[in-house]
């Protein structure tokens, strides 16, 4: 029997707010354990939560970006369960009345554009963190307790593991473009649970699903879903029954393992939090946030093609990340040459970022200085070959390209007399190749150009070298 995969994702996006969701403690990642805490984080008696306004605005922002309906009235609820890193014994979340509902995310997993529907986006707080790798003890770090999250819940519209990965990457791109999260999966800023089931092809009823947790990369999302598909298929083909459960992905072993039986909503005994008033969003707030939304990747790529006359492929690559697109546009503003700027950003800049494991925000060469380097090529001050040397020196020193060119004496030689002297010396030193060229082996022109450029240490104007060579070779 042939089966169809059905996947829905629950994505937890950690917001990059300065303070936590319901108190004034810092939400910054990486601090010493249990230092970013207060009576609210620790659930001490009498401590009352106060909702961070920025969390509401970020939720509305993401809702508008994904075409959701924004609820004018939504409610914060208590999700009750026991876990050592949840000191209150409940998590503040939303249930029956989320702030955003019925949205859409567009993906392309290689088979054309697909629309993945969203059930809801809701506000919740993160739990603390259990640490198991210090001796035989388990420790609790509550720095993360109360850090604001948005949970993005999709309909089960995904049909392959690649679509699931593409969807998660798209969500990450959206939240990064909006500036509400860094989307760092390694640090837990973006986490994903996958609800996976199989059903016979042609059936409309869903099969029993399992929830997969602990997937900390796009590749692991694909691998975990693929593994679970095969596990389900083997059980079904053997006449077995799929258990509704939560399973953990073990990346080292390449397999999932049972964690617990999958809970239903009623297991959490949701009810409105009596310590928090309803969340009210008026039309004025919606209109203001809508007016502040950035230009999104697809729109920006179309504009790049129209405005800068660069290929659609270049535009798509340059707009994957907002910061890279900004960097490109600033370099074009200075260089005046969009295609050259595109080539340099996609080539040399991205090479360095990849080799050094850096983000564009950490790149040492400012976009206006890259633009200045490209402008020097356009003005004939330096050749492209010399420009690459200058680029490496800029990486080390951070100096402006014009300063480096002057200091290192790298300006291009355009003195026709000096070039003619070198060309004549090369021709005199290679009589055999000269005779062969004049005998019809015109491909030897490249040999003579190379010799001349080598003699002048790459600083000769290539166009002038070609012109002088051709005149003398044909003479």
Curated annotation (Swiss-Prot):
| SMART domains per the UniProt record, alphabetical | GatB_Yqey (SM00845)
Q: Which domain of life is it from?
A: Bacteria
Subunit structure of this chain's protein: Heterotrimer of A, B and C subunits.
Q: Which molecular-function annotation in GO is an example for this chain?
A: ATP binding
Q: Catalysed reaction per UniProt?
A: L-glutamyl-tRNA(Gln) + L-glutamine + ATP + H2O = L-glutaminyl-tRNA(Gln) + L-glutamate + ADP + phosphate + H(+); L-aspartyl-tRNA(Asn) + L-glutamine + ATP + H2O = L-asparaginyl-tRNA(Asn) + L-glutamate + ADP + phosphate + 2 H(+)
What general EC class does the enzyme of this chain belong to?
Answer: ligase
Similarity comment: family membership: Belongs to the GatB/GatE family. GatB subfamily.
Q: What is its EC number?
A: 6.3.5.-
Question: NCBIfam families from the xrefs?
Answer: gatB (TIGR00133), PRK05477.1-2 (NF004012), PRK05477.1-4 (NF004014), PRK05477.1-5 (NF004015)
Q: Could you identify this protein by its name?
A: Aspartyl/glutamyl-tRNA(Asn/Gln) amidotransferase subunit B
- Encoding gene, per UniProt annotation: gatB
What keywords were assigned to this record? ATP-binding, Ligase, Nucleotide-binding, Protein biosynthesis
Report the function annotation for this chain.
Allows the formation of correctly charged Asn-tRNA(Asn) or Gln-tRNA(Gln) through the transamidation of misacylated Asp-tRNA(Asn) or Glu-tRNA(Gln) in organisms which lack either or both of asparaginyl-tRNA or glutaminyl-tRNA synthetases. The reaction takes place in the presence of glutamine and ATP through an activated phospho-Asp-tRNA(Asn) or phospho-Glu-tRNA(Gln).
Q: Which InterPro entries match?
A: Asn/Gln-tRNA_amidoTrfase_suB/E, Asn/Gln-tRNA_Trfase_suB/E_cat, Asn/Gln_amidotransferase, Asn/Gln_tRNA_amidoTrase-B-like, GatB, GatB_C_1, GatB_Yqey_C_2, Gln-tRNA_amidoTrfase_suB_CS
In its UniProt record, which GO terms are filed under biological process? glutaminyl-tRNAGln biosynthesis via transamidation; translation
């Amino acid at each position: 029997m042939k089966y169809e995969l059905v996947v829905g994702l629950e994505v937890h996006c950690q917001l990059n707010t300065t303070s936590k969701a319901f108190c004034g403690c810092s939400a910054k990642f990486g601090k010493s354990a249990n230092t970013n805490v207060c009576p609210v984080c620790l659930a001490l008696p009498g401590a009352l939560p106060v909702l961070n306004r920025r969390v509401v605005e970020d939720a509305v922002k993401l809702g508008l970006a994904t075409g959701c309906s924004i609820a004018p009235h939504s409610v914060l609820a208590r999700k009750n369960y026991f876990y050592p890193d949840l000191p209150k014994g409940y998590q503040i979340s939303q249930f029956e009345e989320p702030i955003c509902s019925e949205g859409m995310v567009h993906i392309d997993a290689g088979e054309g554009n697909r629309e993945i529907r969203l059930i809801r986006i809701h506000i919740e707080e993160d739990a603390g963190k259990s640490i198991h790798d210090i001796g035989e003890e388990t420790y609790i770090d509550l720095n993360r307790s109360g850090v604001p999250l948005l949970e993005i819940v999709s309909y089960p519209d995904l049909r392959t593991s690649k679509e699931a990965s593409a969807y998660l990457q798209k969500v990450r791109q959206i939240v990064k473009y909006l500036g509400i999260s860094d989307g760092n999966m390694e640090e837990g800023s973006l986490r994903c649970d996958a609800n996976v089931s199989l059903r016979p092809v042609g059936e409309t009823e869903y099969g029993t699903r399992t929830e997969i947790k602990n997937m900390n990369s796009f590749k692991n999302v694909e691998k975990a879903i693929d593994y679970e598909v095969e596990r389900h298929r083997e059980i079904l083909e053997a006449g077995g029954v799929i258990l509704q459960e939560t399973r953990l992905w073990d990346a080292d072993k390449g397999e999932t393992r049972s964690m617990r039986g999958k809970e239903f909503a009623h297991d959490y005994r949701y009810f409105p939090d009596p310590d928090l008033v309803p969340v009210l969003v008026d039309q004025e707030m919606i209109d203001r946030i809508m007016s502040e939304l950035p230009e999104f990747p697809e729109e920006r790529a179309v504009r790049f093609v129209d405005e800068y006359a660069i290929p659609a492929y270049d535009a798509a690559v340059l707009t994957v990340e907002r910061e890279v697109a900004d960097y490109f546009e600033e370099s074009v503003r200075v260089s005046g040459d969009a295609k050259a700027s595109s080539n340099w950003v996609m080539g040399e800049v991205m090479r360095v970022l990849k080799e050094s494991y850096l983000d564009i925000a950490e790149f040492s060469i400012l976009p206006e200085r890259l633009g200045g380097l490209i402008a020097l090529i356009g003005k004939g001050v330096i050749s492209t070959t010399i420009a690459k040397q200058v680029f490496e020196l800029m990486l080390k020193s951070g100096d402006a390209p014009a300063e480096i060119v002057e200091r290192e004496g790298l300006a291009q030689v355009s003195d026709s007399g000096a070039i003619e002297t070198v060309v004549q010396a090369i021709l005199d030193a290679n009589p055999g190749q000269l005779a062969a060229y004049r005998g019809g082996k015109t491909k030897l022109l490249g040999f003579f150009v190379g010799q001349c450029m080598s003699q002048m240490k790459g600083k000769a104007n290539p166009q002038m070298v070609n012109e002088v060579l051709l005149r003398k070779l044909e003479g």
